[in-house]
Amino acid sequence: MIEVKDLNKSFGSFKVLDGLNIRVKKSSVYGLLGPNGAGKTTLIKHLAGIYKQDSGSILVNGEPVFENPAVKSSVAYISDDLYFFSQYSIDETARFYSTMYPKWNWKRYEQLKQVFPIDSGKRVTRLSKGMQKQVAFWLAICTMPEVMLLDEPVDGLDPVMRKKVWNLVLQDVAEREVCVMVSSHNLRELEDVCDHVGILHNGKIIVERELDNMKSDIHKIQVAYSGSIPENILSGEEILHRSQNGSVLLMIAKGDREKILAKIRESSPAILDILPLTLEEIFIYELGGIGYDIKN
C-alpha cells in the first residue's frame, strides 16, 4: 500500500509538490494524470525513494521508503528513461537483480522467456528502445514486487507486446495483490487498466476518484431540436463544454445525471442521447473547468 501525507517538494524557488495527499490500496491500479510539469515523475521518484521530501510523509506498506533498503526491495520502478549497465547482457543483469532483490524468482525469469522473445545473452544497451522496455518489465516482474511504479511504461512497445505486458501486471494485481501506480499520457490505455484515477495539477491532486464513479459524475449529452435551440437549457448546472452544429447541441455536464436529463427534457428536444465518455474527455474537461486554456 502507498500512503502519502502532506508531501512538499521544491527545487530552488519552484514548488513542485504542494501538500500532496494520496493513498493507493493493495490489489489496485492507480492512474496518475496531469499536464506536463504537474509533478507526476517527481512524485513517483519520491515513492521509489530516489528523492527526499522537504516535508510530509511517504509510506510503503507502513514504512518510510527513503534510505530504507528493505522497503525498496519490495518496490519495482520502471522509469521513462531506462538505464542499464553498458556491458551487461540480460542474463548478467538478471544475476545482478537477484543479489539486490531477496524475492527474485529464477523460475519466473525462465518462464517469461516465452513472453519476451529476446536472446537473453545479448547486451541490453545494444537492443532497441522497445526491446529495452520489454527487458525492464521482464526483470521488474521477476523481483516479485509488492508495489510497482510505472512512469510512461509502455512507450515504444507495439500493440501486441503492450497487451502482453499489461496482462502480466494485472495478473499480479489479481493474484498477489500488487499495488500499482502508473503515470501515462496514453489516457485510452489507462482507461483499460486502472480502477482509480488522480489528476495532478500544480503539485496537488485536484480530482481523485474510482474510474467508474468519475465517469458517472460527468456526462456527454447530445440534443437536437426541430426548431431553434432554446437558450439556457442547463443554466442551473455546471457546463464544462458546449458546442453547436446546426440544430444539434453537444454538452459536457457535471452533476446528477437524472436531474440534468430532467432539466433538458423541459425544453422538449426532438432527440436526447447520452454518449460514451472517454477518460481523455474527462481529463480535458475537468482541467478545462479549473481554468485550463484547452481548445477543441
Question: What spans do the regions from the language model cover?
Answer:
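C-terminal coupling/interaction segments
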Residues: 252-296
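ABC transporter nucleotide-binding domain
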Residues: 165-255
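Short, surface-exposed beta-strand/loop "edge" segments at domain boundaries and coil↔beta transitions
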Residues: 148-149, 153, 228-232, 258-261
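Short loop/turn segments at beta->alpha junctions
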Residues: 89, 210, 275-278
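ABC-family P-loop ATPase nucleotide-binding domain
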Residues: 1-8, 290-296
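A structural detector for beta-sheet-dominated domains
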Residues: 5, 25, 224-226, 254, ...
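ABC transporter nucleotide-binding domains
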Residues: 2-4, 9-195, 199-201
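Short, flexible helix/strand-to-coil boundary loops that buttress conserved ligand/catalytic motifs
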Residues: 69, 215-218, 234, 264, ...
